């Protein structure tokens, strides 16, 4: 795999990437996940996004770079993971996924895990 794009900031380390992908997989099973850059944009505009995950190996990366700007406007944490293929697998689809959004649900079974990951992502952004 080539080196991640320098525009992909903040990039999660291996341990955090694994934790993020685990939460993504559980959220996908609970229908609490939106896949793709367009759907992630919609969740941000509607204000129902907990955090945004993007793939750093997206080519060209510019097709994703409107998301960090929107996230900062809406005060939503965002993070890059190294692989779009791994993100696609975690989302439960057979295709690569370049962006995903964990959506808000107060009655969620994985609420504590979502908040734990969200806090770690927020510390990366500082």
Curated annotation (Swiss-Prot):
The subcellular localization recorded is:
Nucleus, Nucleolus
List the record's Gene Ontology CC terms alphabetically.
box C/D methylation guide snoRNP complex; nucleolus; nucleoplasm; nucleus; precatalytic spliceosome; small-subunit processome; spliceosomal complex; U4 snRNP
Where is this chain primarily localised? nucleus
Annotated PANTHER family: RIBOSOMAL PROTEIN L7AE FAMILY MEMBER (PTHR23105)
Membership in a protein family:
Belongs to the eukaryotic ribosomal protein eL8 family.
Q: How does it assemble?
A: Binds to the C'/D and B/C motifs in U3 snoRNA. Component of the U4/U6-U5 tri-snRNP complex composed of the U4, U6 and U5 snRNAs and at least PRP3, PRP4, PRP6, PRP8, PRP18, PRP31, PRP38, SNU13, SNU23, SNU66, SNU114, SPP381, SMB1, SMD1, SMD2, SMD3, SMX2, SMX3, LSM2, LSM3, LSM4, LSM5, LSM6, LSM7, LSM8, BRR2 and DIB1. Binds to the 5'-stem-loop of U4 snRNA. Component of the ribosomal small subunit (SSU) processome composed of at least 40 protein subunits and snoRNA U3.
Q: What protein name applies here? A: 13 kDa ribonucleoprotein-associated protein
